[in-house]
Every structure is written in C-alpha cells, then in structure tokens.
Amino acid sequence: MTKERVIIIGSGIAGCTAALRLMQDYDVTIITKGHKEQSNSMLAQGGVAAAISKSDTPKKHFSDTFQAGCFHNKVRAVNQLVTCGPIVIQKLINEGMTFDEKDGELSLGLEGAHQLPRILHSGGDQTGKFLTTFLQEKLTKVNWQEQKMAIEIIKHDGRAIGVHCLDKENQLHTYYGEHIILASGGLGQLFPVTTNAATISGDGLALAYRADATLSDMEFIQFHPTLLFLNGRCHGLISEAVRGEGATLIRADGSAIMETVHPLADLAPRDVVAATLFEEIERGNQVFLDITKVAHFEKRFPAITTSLDEHQVPFRETKRIPVHPGAHFLMGGVRTDLNGKTNIPHLYAIGEVANTGVHGANRLASNSLLETLVFGEKVAEYIHTQKNNRIIAPENPPTYQTTMPHLPEKHILQEKIWETLGITRKPEKITEFLHWLETFDYANHTRETAEISHMIITSKLIAESALKRTESLGAHRILKGVTK
C-alpha cells in the first residue's frame, strides 16, 4: 500500500524532529529555501531550557516562562512545553545526542529571567548546529528538496494539499501531500539588523496568510540585545549565555548600564535589555559587553571566539565586545492548537512560524529550541492518528502575476520596517507605513519578487497588529501607554 505523503517546509529542528518521527510510516519530503544547513536552528548559540535538575521543576519553568511572557501566554501550551521538555530531552539522549557535561553530570547554564540554571548546551555555544546536524543525519528515509522556495500553498475543497515552489532558476516545481507542515522559521530578514539566517524573511507566514490561515500576536517581535556591532553593521549573535557566565553591559566609560534598570540587571528579560540599549545608542552612547568576569571565555564560547577573531575584535586585550540590539524572534505567527494544527485542514505549523501560545508577549531565553522539539514531536504524534487521507491531485496552477510588478528595493523596505516596527513604535509612523505598502503589487513569478512580496505581506500583518495593541506589552513597545 502506498504511504501517505507529508510535505515539510523548512529544514530546522522543528521540521527535522517531525520528519524523524514520521519517516518510517510516511513518504516525507522536506523542502528548504536554501541548503539544508541554512536555518536559524543551525545558528542558535544558546541552548535548550528544561527542568531536569533535582532543584528544578516544570512548575518553576512554567512560572519563569509566564513572567517573561508578561502573562500573555496560553496556560495549556506552556504546561505542555515544560512538562514534555524533560521527556523529549531524555529521548534524544537515549538516541545518542550528547549535551555538555561537568564532573559527569549534565552542565546547566543560566540565562536571563530564569530563576536557576536549566540550560543544556552542546558544543558550548554551538547547540543549534550540533542538534540540527544530529537530527539531519538520522533522516535516512527523507526526500530532500533543497533550494526550492515555496511560493504558494495549494488548497482544494478548503484543505491544504500541496505547495508550489521555485528553484534557483525560477522553474516551477509542485509537491502534493496529505499533510503539509510549515516549519519555515520567523522573519528576521525583514529588518536590516538581525541574528537570523539570510533565508528567513517571513515566507511561511505570508504563505499561510494567503492560504487563509489565522495569524495572531504578530506585533510581538523579540529584539536580541547583543549582536556583534562593527563599523555600523551587525555580524551575528553574541549569546545571552555570555551574560549568564558573568559578562556585563557597559558604556564606553566603563559604567554599568543595567544595574539600576531591573532587579535582574544584565539578566533581565530581553525586551527590557534591548529597549534600554536602544535608548543608550539613541543618546549617542556606544555599548559593550565587558567579559572580564567570564571564566575560560574562549573554551566556553568557541564559535563566538572564532567570529570575534574573524572580525579582528581585540577582545583578549580590551575584554570588551561592541554590541547592538537586532531582530531575533517572532513570538506570534500562525495560530495553532497543541498539536500544531491550523484552522486550515491538513495544514500544520511548528517552530517559530507558529503561534502556539507558549511565548506570550516575550520569549524566555532558550525556550525556542525546546518548542521546536516538543511541537515537532506533537505534530508527528497527531498525524499518526490520522488515517485514510488520500488526495487526488487536481490541476492547480499557481496564481502568477506575470506583468512587471511595482515593488520596493529590498534594502529600502528593510530600513522602513526597522524605522517603523523596530524596538520602539509610534502609531502615526505605522499608519504612514501602511499607506506606503498599499502602493505596491504582489508578485511571485521569481524568487526575488516572491520574497519581497512575502516581506510586504508579513510587515503589513505586524503593522496592523501593532496598531490594534495601543498599549505596550512585552516586546511590543508603542509610545502611547505602557502595561506593566
């Protein structure tokens, strides 16, 4: 009997986890915009948060997650995240995944807004790379389709049945399946300053929107406080774990920035730290990480050390790393239930593209990799319960616009988005931005036009959500009022 087909859009940890749990019983295809190594998961320097120590409990992890999320989280989703977390971690360890140890015990790090150390790492600051590679090497029964950019989710009789893609020569490819899983990541490349991979430009969010899926909480975008900043440009993430190991944020004169701002000082929630640094920079101050108190920095952070050396940062002499906030993570996204189901039958969303409700208004550090693992498992478990979903693929050409479209240049769009929807927002600027967006067309006949069109759709969704939430909450800071 022919196996049912599962199409997964995205090659990060969420998609690979789902693929691993489905490939024995389903015909699984993973479609990825770039090469399979290109994902935010591969870049993740932090770790995986899980309540696995004797002094920790899921209840404590639940509390920290809710407080960081400004109590905008969904209770059942957070409960699933923190209770399943230790289980999925142990499952991975049993399958051969190795996490860093100290004195024969799992080494647990501390990060912002966690009340105690609970962060597992692998390869120091290379957890995302090690975990993604571990999963991908196990995907022996998966059909990989690399450098295929999804441009449209195909629907028939109200259900998702496939996806249209363009290869790097802009040739059309169509894939049909009984189950379509969006695992395409977030939207960092909407901004000129971001930690995200070059391929992450909100494609999955725009595809879902055009397929009539419900999206929510799009105003909640986390800006990471510390990107390496040199000569007016950012060059990747400096992990929060560096502050967890004792680094402090300082001005050029050496004065501490965070100690009078929040009780947790340098380990305050990311929205607080990012906004504080943004204000410092707006006042003309340079911002640095002082790593004087970080023991064995180069051993603990090998990937960051390599990056600093490549960019000729004299950190060994100065004990300083120049930093700047940048777009990092979307808390909102395609609304799903606890199994990753969207409102469109047979369309699922997992990982950063999804809004499961676990993060609320601001994500707790290292909960993102945990989310990918837990919900990757959950969507696979659910699909295993669904039988006899066979579809007959209809003739369904993509909805091309073949006339010459009117679209902005990518860098101009990025700058506009940063000015309007960055760390601090103003209603009048958002309204002006929405009017500007209305002057452009939609097109998907080439990868370039599709990407810019997806960026326009996604930024419009963010702007509309930001206008509706008239008071600040978590990562959404709008200059009309503040909700504590």
From Swiss-Prot:
Coiled-coil region(s): none
PANTHER family named among the record's database cross-references: L-ASPARTATE OXIDASE (PTHR42716), L-ASPARTATE OXIDASE, CHLOROPLASTIC (PTHR42716:SF2)
NCBIfam families reported for this sequence: nadB, PRK08071.1
GO biological process: 'de novo' NAD biosynthetic process from L-aspartate
Binding, FAD: 11-14, 33, 40-47, 203, 352, 368-369
Name of the featured protein: L-aspartate oxidase
Described function: Catalyzes the oxidation of L-aspartate to iminoaspartate, the first step in the de novo biosynthesis of NAD(+).
Pathway(s) this gene product operates in, as recorded in its UniProt entry: Cofactor biosynthesis; NAD(+) biosynthesis; iminoaspartate from L-aspartate (oxidase route): step 1/1
Name of encoding gene: nadB
Predominant cellular place of this UniProt entry's protein: cytoplasm
